[in-house]
Regions:
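A glycine/serine/threonine-rich, flexible loop-to-helix segment
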Residues: 207-209, 231, 242-267, 306-307
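Substrate-binding pocket helix/loop in short-chain dehydrogenase/reductase
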Residues: 155-157, 161-166, 262
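Short C-terminal tail/terminal secondary-structure segment
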Residues: 5, 10-11, 42, 50-51, ...
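Short, small/polar-rich loop/turn modules that mediate ligand/substrate recognition or access, typified
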Residues: 230, 235, 292-294
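A short, exposed helix-loop element centered on a Lys and neighboring polar residues
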Residues: 180-181, 223
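C-terminal substrate-recognition "lid" of short-chain dehydrogenase/reductases
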Residues: 138, 177, 186, 270-299, ...
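Catalytic loop of short-chain dehydrogenase/reductase
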Residues: 149-151, 194-231, 243-244
Length: 307
C-alpha cells in the first residue's frame, strides 16, 4: 500500500462471536453516493464486525480470496475469516481503495496475512489475474468467495441500456465464472467455493430486473458446480441475503426515497447488518461444513425465500 496515506484507526472488538452489535433502526439517511460507493461515508455506519465479531479458530491455516472484500458482506466475511485464523486476500474496485485499506489493517491486526488486489472484474484478464495473484501471495488457496456484485435500480426495462445490462452481467455472472475456472487448479480436496446470491433469486423485485436474473444464475452456479466438483472433494455453496445495509444499496441499488425505510418491512423490522451474514460464510468455509455442498443459505430477517 502507498506510504503517503494515513493508516486507519482500528476500533477494539468485543468478546463473543457476535456480541451485542449496535444495530441501528430505521429511518436511515437517504443520502446517495456515486457508484461503487464507500462504507466509510454511509449513514448510519454498517456493522461489518469491526467491534462485534470475535473468532474461535474455525479457519486456522486456511487461505481465502474474497471479492468485493472492501465493504458490505465481503468486508464482514474477510474480517471474520481473519479472526477465525485465515490469511485473506481481498479484491475491490480501484475506486474503493480507502475502504479496502481499513479492511487490510483489520486483517493485519489479527496477525494474519492480508493481500490487497484492486481490479475491475468486468475485465476477464483482470479477473483471472486477481486469482493468480492471490494464490501466489498466499501460497495457495482453500476458500474462494465470489461476492463482488453490481446492483442498479431501474423503474422499467426500457430504462436499462445495453451497456448497463452488460456491466451487471459481466460483474455478477462472467466474473465468478472466470475466477472459479482460474482457481480450480489450485483448489484441492476440502476446498470451498462460496458465491453470493440473493433473496432476489427467489422473489425478484420489479426494480431489480437485471440484478435478480444474475442472482438466480448465481444460485444455479452453486448447484451445478457442486455436482461437478463433488468427486474432487471441493464444496460449492451459495448465500442468499435479504435486505442488508451495504454500500451497494446507497450507490444506485435502491431508489433514494426507499433508503430511509430500507429493510423495515422484514419481520425483524430492520435491515440486516453485514456482520449478521458473515457467520454463514465462516461455516461454509470451515471443515464443519464437510457434508454441505450445492446448498443456498438464506438470511432474510424472517421474510423467507418463497422458494
Amino acid at each position: 500500500m502507498a506510504d503517503d496515506k494515513t493508516d486507519p484507526v482500528l476500533p477494539p472488538h468485543r468478546s463473543g462471536a457476535i456480541s451485542d452489535p449496535d444495530l441501528p433502526l430505521n429511518p436511515y439517511s437517504d443520502d446517495q453516493q456515486p457508484w461503487p460507493g464507500l462504507a466509510e461515508k454511509m449513514d448510519p455506519q454498517p456493522d461489518h464486525g469491526e467491534q462485534s465479531y470475535k473468532g474461535r479458530d474455525r479457519l486456522t491455516g486456511k487461505r481465502a480470496l474474497v471479492t468485493g472484500g472492501d465493504s458490505g458482506i465481503g468486508r464482514a466475511a474477510a474480517i471474520a475469516f481473519a479472526r477465525e485464523g485465515a490469511d485473506v486476500a481481498i479484491n475491490y474496485h480501484p475506486d474503493e481503495e480507502s475502504d479496502a485499506r481499513t479492511v487490510i489493517a483489520l486483517i493485519e491486526a489479527e496477525g494474519r496475512k492480508a493481500v490487497a488486489l484492486p481490479a475491475d472484474l468486468r475485465d476477464e484478464a483482470a479477473a483471472r489475474k486477481v486469482v493468480d495473484d492471490a494464490v501466489k501471495a498466499l501460497g495457495g488457496l482453500e476458500v474462494l468467495v465470489l461476492n463482488a456484485g453490481r446492483q442498479q435500480a431501474a423503474k422499467s426495462i426500457e430504462d436499462i441500456t445495453s451497456d448497463a445490462f452488460d456491466a451487471t452481467i459481466k460483474t455478477n455472472i462472467y466474473a465468478p465464472f472466470w475466477m472459479a475456472q482460474q482457481a480450480l487448479p489450485s483448489l484441492k480436496n476440502g476446498a470451498s467455493i462460496i458465491i453470493t446470491s440473493s433473496v432476489q433469486a427467489f422473489s425478484p423485485s420489479a426494480h431489480l430486473f437485471d440484478y435478480a436474473q444474475t442472482k438466480a444464475a448465481n444460485r444455479a452456479f452453486a448447484q451445478a458446480l457442486a455436482k461437478q466438483l463433488a468427486p474432487k472433494g471441493i464444496r460449492v455453496n451459495a448465500v442468499a441475503p435479504g435486505p442488508v445495509w451495504t454500500a451497494l444499496q446507497v450507490s444506485g441499488g435502491q431508489f433514494k426515497d426507499k433508503l430511509p425505510e430500507f429493510g423495515a418491512d422484514s419481520p425483524l423490522g430492520r435491515p440486516g447488518q453485514p456482520v449478521e451474514i458473515a457467520p454463514i460464510y465462516v461455516l461454509l468455509a470451515s471443515d464443519e461444513a464437510s457434508y454441505i455442498t450445492g446448498e443456498c443459505y438464506a438470511a432474510t430477517g424472517g421474510s423467507g425465500t418463497g422458494g
